[in-house]
Amino acid sequence: MKGYFRKRGNTWSFTVDIGRKPDGSREQKTKGGFKTKKEAEKACAELITLIGRNNYIEPSKKAISDLMLEWLDYQLKATLRLSTYENYSKAILKRLIPAFGHVKLGELKPVHIQKYYKRLQDENLTPEYITYLHAIMRSFMKYQIRIQNIQSNIFDLVDPPTIRKKEKAVWSIEEINRFLSIAKEEKNHNFYMIYLIAIYTGLRRGEVLALRWKDIDLTNGKLSVCQNLYYSKGGEFHFWEPKTGRSNRLVSIPESLVKELQVHKELQQHHITKVGEIYDDLGLVIANELGVPIHPRSLTDNFRRLIKKSNVTKIRFHDLRHTHATILLQLGEHVKIVSERLGHSDASMTMNVYSHVTRDMQEQTARRFEEAMKLKKLIEF
């Protein structure tokens, strides 16, 4: 098997036989656009090698938009959680199809991707979000390889922008106490309990909102994280089991939180008795006046308002989780215990997320060691 080369204008192309068509006639593949004959010969040799190993796949001539919509509807819808599917769908329809949809699958080049990432950076989109889009496209291309629409994953040849690690925004203990003091004065006791549970346990927002009374052992001071709450775009709420086995966990809680939960339970029971049958009792620890889960949007609005009112550092709700972990590590708690409380896959993940805290602790350890050595010298003298 050999290739045939020709020069057209300033570029070289080659043609090679790739097999026989169903009618017995020769099937050929032509590739062009090479600056030199040497480049064309190299590409031709690689193609012939693939054909010889029966590894050559003719790239699909379908538009990326058609293939991506098929992937979204038939593959992702059946395999992803609703929350992940909705996020993927939004990114694909709003960002990726407008960018790459008109291009045929086999004609996408690294330069297309690089230019798109540059455009997104010019729009001031974060490296984290661009990396998220990159991950979606890599996954899409991986699927196209699996169903033999392409030979290789072009997104493996392009790097997304570098993500610079930022220090987690956390509250001091003084800020926590000031915020909780303001929250406790609010008419709606639910929000105060949400913040209290999040700060004292490190639970995620969906985990706090999905807690049921049967998940809490008030006698022994334990709570079980068994499910997560998600509100779909249509406004419906869903309860799911945690993503991983480690997320499904048992968390010890202090006596002060136990007492607050007991008070909250009494207030809730009083409300249920008062409103009667209109209360849809799902057994939730945190529920609105009708018994259904608090909407995350309502929580965000309340959180932002109370931050302003209590004059504390502006953070996200998720940063309460970081605050919990940071305080534990600063107190000298073993990283494995912190990892278990947070539901991380392993302690190395916790070390990576909170490396800035452990770095400070390393410096403190070095100082303590030096002080111990000085003390030893004094004793010897």
Indicate where each model-derived feature is located.
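Short amphipathic beta-strand and strand-loop transition segments with alternating hydrophobic
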Residues: M1-K7
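N-terminal DNA-binding module of tyrosine recombinases/phage integrases
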Residues: R8-S13, I18-V111, H264-D281
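Catalytic-site neighborhood detector that most strongly recognizes the C-terminal catalytic loop/helix
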Residues: T162, K166, V170, N228-Y231, ...
